[in-house]
Amino acid sequence: MPGFLVRILPLLLPLLLLGPTRGLRNATRRVFEIAYSQDRFLKDGQPFRYISGSIHYSRVPRFYWKDRLLKMKMAGLNTIQTYVPWNFHEPWPGQYQFSEDHDVEYFLRLAHELGLLVILRPGPYICAEWEMGGLPAWLLEKEAILLRSSDPDYLAAVDKWLGVLLPKMKPLLYQNGGPIITVQVENEYGSYFACDFDYLRFLQKRFHHHLGDDVVLFTTDGAHETFLQCGALQGLYTTVDFGPGSNITDAFQIQRKCEPKGPLINSEFYTGWLDHWGQPHSTIKTEVVASSLYDILARGASVNLYMFIGGTNFAYWNGANSPYAAQPTSYDYDAPLSEAGDLTEKYFALRNVIQKFEKVPEGPIPPSTPKFAYGKVSLEKLKTVGAALDILCPSGPIKSLYPLTFIQVKQYYGFVLYRTTLPQDCSNSTPLSSPFNGVHDRAYVAVDGIPQGVLERNRVITLNITGKTGATLDLLVENMGRVNYGAYINDFKGLVSNLTLDSNILTGWTIFPLDTEDAVRSHLGGWEHRDSGRHDEAWAHSSSNYTLPAFYVGNFSIPSGIPDLPQDTFIQFPGWTKGQVWINGFNLGRYWPARGPQLTLFVPQHILMTSAPNTITVLELERAPCSSDGPELCAVEFVDRPVIGSSQIYDHLSKPVEQRLMAPPPKKTKIRGWSMYDDESL
């Protein structure tokens, strides 16, 4: 062996043993930092500003992560921003999900492979129009817990969760060879009433403990002094958020009051806006968004476009606002990429703005995915919920003198059936009431199998019913999504207070927590063989124009002889009212064409099969189109175009803060971190 190799080998051996990635990192240290004196970021010593877009991996199937990320890169973005919803990964205490659609590490590595940097927003609270703002519902088992505070019960749960999540993130930090350049602590905390600096300091210490002292930690709050009073903390870099039409100079001056030096940052520049059931679909004009983006970039600021792709609130993951208004299944957000990942006019307009400031990648942009209209599919009614309780609640019911909440029976999402008997004769219409607005969120009411109507949070708290003494009173209660923003995120579900019948409190409840997911995946297929056809009990209906909540099932096959199938599609519900839909056991989410604005649900191709028929399961809660007195068929239809609502341009984003606070619609005017209610009721 040559002499110089003998001398140098002991020096090289430690690097060789570290492997290629770690060895390179030690040989050439990667650094991402704030250069306060230069009012900018430095990446490996060079000036840097990010142009980022928000994508929530929890709202996009893993099957499509690469497609969406590539489209974001080709738009000229150099960074993506994503939330980590705690409840998406720990839906039950101590039971963690980090595989398949929950594999956040894979998602971040994929972004890295595509040359995208990452802004990580791990909460623990995220808002995001997501169920309970990303906090797990099981936290409410401590009924007096004060969320987002230094409450010991809350801190203990947060500490345990961060101890699971953040060590997974540390190898993915930029300085460790990964894509994560900055990490947000909490989320718009200045908009929350608690104003608990001990809580923020606790988070700051735990983030540094798990991620190291050289990680860039930041906060985000609305561009108003009020929010920064409780949202900013020394040692966490303060950023602001605001939408198109805002006064950019004023907004960044607010940031400068907390951060006299350092980069200007808009962490949430709104490309669109959120929706609620029963309100028009929100859009913001492309030219308004493009013009404001140009002005932000012209100031040398870093910016994140919220959202660049919205995606879908599959299953039960949508959130809600106060006064109670649930968000729909679609989180399209009028973003540059549609819910289905399609290129829009806004995409190309914003790309044109970005390329005036930064070089955009050359080459073809991945096209919009093809869609296919599979047509109508007939569905057969199987059983009502009441007739299927042995399958839906295999462990049996819970007895209680007074009604229990979802949390008390450990049912965090979905449905619970509450049953008691009428203690008096109600041959004449008798008021069934929730005097303290205690139905959270909708209750489908029946007496001896005869539907009576619906009780609904904030909207319908009294319903006249009829029945004889001793008749069975059923209330199927639906959790429509927990409040994700504001003071009322301690959102208990079910019957959260007593019901009265003609002013008398009802007692003696039998409570059935329903495992609809397991039933749909494992058992529904067997129902058809055991008990097919229409059921007289199931089809009972009254003058209230409701039918009993029931399951419907149908099958369809992907056409043969057509290349490149299956393809994405959209399912619509002509004549149906409100419910939940599954395809091949995959919970697509809620449909509610009777209220809108969303009429179709996105169906990604990866859940469809070509080797066997595809099974559609519908749980209709109010009224199906094929009731016993009508000629209509029970059918759904697959179409190749989405219908998520009529276009409605809300002008509340372009008004001064003082005007925005009072301007409907929506009734809750929220500038992400700024909210004013005309009614603070639950």
UniProtKB/Swiss-Prot annotation:
Residues 1-23 form the signal peptide. GO terms for cellular component: lysosome. Glycans are attached at N26, N247, N464, N498, N545, N555. Its main location: other. InterPro entries: B-gal_1-like, BetaGal1-like_ABD1, BetaGal_gal-bd, Galactose-bd-like_sf, Gly_Hdrlase_35_cat, Glyco_hydro_35_CS, Glycoside_Hdrlase_35, Glycoside_hydrolase_SF. Its EC number is 3.2.1.23. The keyword Glycoprotein applies. Disulfide bonds join C195-C230, C626-C634. Keywords: Disulfide bond, Glycoprotein, Glycosidase, Hydrolase, Lysosome, Signal, Zymogen. It is found in: Lysosome. The active site is at E188 (proton donor), E268 (nucleophile). Homodimer. May form higher multimers. This is Beta-galactosidase. It comes from Macaca fascicularis (Crab-eating macaque). The lineage of its organism: Eukaryota, Metazoa, Chordata, Craniata, Vertebrata. The gene is GLB1.
